[in-house]
Amino acid sequence: MAAGAAEAAVAAVEEVGSAGQFEELLRLKAKSLLVVHFWAPWAPQCAQMNEVMAELAKELPQVSFVKLEAEGVPEVSEKYEISSVPTFLFFKNSQKIDRLDGAHAPELTKKVQRHASSGSFLPSANEHLKEDLNLRLKKLTHAAPCMLFMKGTPQEPRCGFSKQMVEILHKHNIQFSSFDIFSDEEVRQGLKAYSSWPTYPQLYVSGELIGGLDIIKELEASEELDTICPKAPKLEERLKVLTNKASVMLFMKGNKQEAKCGFSKQILEILNSTGVEYETFDILEDEEVRQGLKAYSNWPTYPQLYVKGELVGGLDIVKELKENGELLPILRGEN
């Protein structure tokens, strides 16, 4: 009986192996909610989230659940800008309506239930959701001293106004973090009401709305922009500080809890086996550091391991040092 139930749960989560199959599924499931898990077999957190999906599939038979190996169908992953696993996309009427990055089972459950209900919540539930959203928006607007809510990313703006805003901030060497409103429809709509500002991009400093592109242009013209927004340290200075942040620093895809590529996962396992304390930096979260560190250390790939600010090397070198018995003395600063 238990085995049969497990098989039914697995069967409820379809697997997609090609771009053509994915497009066909979007058409076939257009009238229902489609939840797609972009996963990788090397990431244990993906296996856990597959189990969560299987449980949700049993509870919500009207929802279609699909898993797609991100590296196995790269054209689909690139189209939807999947840069890490696990990532979940939500579709209705063949259109993407929401996104969730990371292994967050409670958030996945909440999003699936909300989209599956299509506005059929009781008023009390709606009020509760509104309260949750406002709390989330407050956290997002305070996520960095200067936060830009835009269409796309600073590297790939997806509208002319967002592109101009990024250019102005870069021109004035302003340090900012960004949020892609296309990645989360709930935030996109909710922030308009939260700040009584109907358009994007929106710039916040210390959680307070400064304004959109026109306001920023006015502040630039009146030379007030430089006094309002925090300045970014020069990249080389920043990289020097980062590489010296801890005695042993690993620059990787992901973090200690969630490696987001096979090479990073392997180097974590090696470092963990030494018992030496180390810190990590997720290069997927900062494109400037990701590109700048390659030139700074003349090393083109990741992960990169540093001891006392000096580059040791990547995975292959760390493997060699371990085999030769040299890794531990280097990590301890004895060499």
Curated annotation (Swiss-Prot):
The modification N-acetylalanine is found at residue 2. Coiled coil: none annotated. [2Fe-2S] cluster binds at residues 159, 261. GO terms for cellular component: cell cortex; cytoplasm; cytosol; dendrite; iron-sulfur cluster assembly complex; nucleus; Z disc. SUPFAM superfamilies: Thioredoxin-like. Changing residue 261 to S: Loss of 2Fe-2S-binding. Loss of 2Fe-2S-binding and interaction with BOLA2. Residues 2-117 form the Thioredoxin domain. Pfam families: Glutaredoxin (PF00462), Thioredoxin (PF00085). Residues 144-236, 237-335 form the Glutaredoxin domain. The modification Phosphoserine is found at residues 117, 120. Keywords: Acetylation, Cytoplasm, Iron, Iron-sulfur, Metal-binding, Phosphoprotein, Repeat. It is found in: Cytoplasm, Cytosol; Cytoplasm, Cell cortex; Cytoplasm, Myofibril, Sarcomere, Z line. PROSITE patterns: GLUTAREDOXIN_2, THIOREDOXIN_2. Its main location: cytoplasm. It comes from the Eukaryota. Expressed in heart, spleen, testis and, to a lower extent, in thymus and peripheral blood leukocytes. Weakly expressed in lung, placenta, colon and small intestine. CDD domains: GRX_PICOT_like, TRX_PICOT. One of its GO terms (biological process) is negative regulation of cardiac muscle hypertrophy. Together with BOLA2, acts as a cytosolic iron-sulfur (Fe-S) cluster assembly factor that facilitates [2Fe-2S] cluster insertion into a subset of cytosolic proteins. Acts as a critical negative regulator of cardiac hypertrophy and a positive inotropic regulator. Required for hemoglobin maturation. Does not possess any thyoredoxin activity since it lacks the conserved motif that is essential for catalytic activity. The thioredoxin domain lacks the two redox-active cysteines. This strongly suggests that it lacks thioredoxin activity. Homodimer; the homodimer is independent of 2Fe-2S clusters. Heterotrimer; forms a heterotrimeric complex composed by two BOLA2 molecules and one GLRX3 molecule; linked by [2Fe-2S] clusters. Interacts (via N-terminus) with PRKCQ/PKC-theta. Interacts (via C-terminus) with CSRP3. Interacts with CSRP2. Silencing of Grx3 in HeLa cells decreases the activities of several cytosolic Fe/S proteins, such as ACO1, a major component of post-transcriptional iron regulation. As a consequence, Grx3-depleted cells show decreased levels of ferritin and increased levels of transferrin receptor, features characteristic of cellular iron starvation. This is Glutaredoxin-3. The gene is GLRX3.
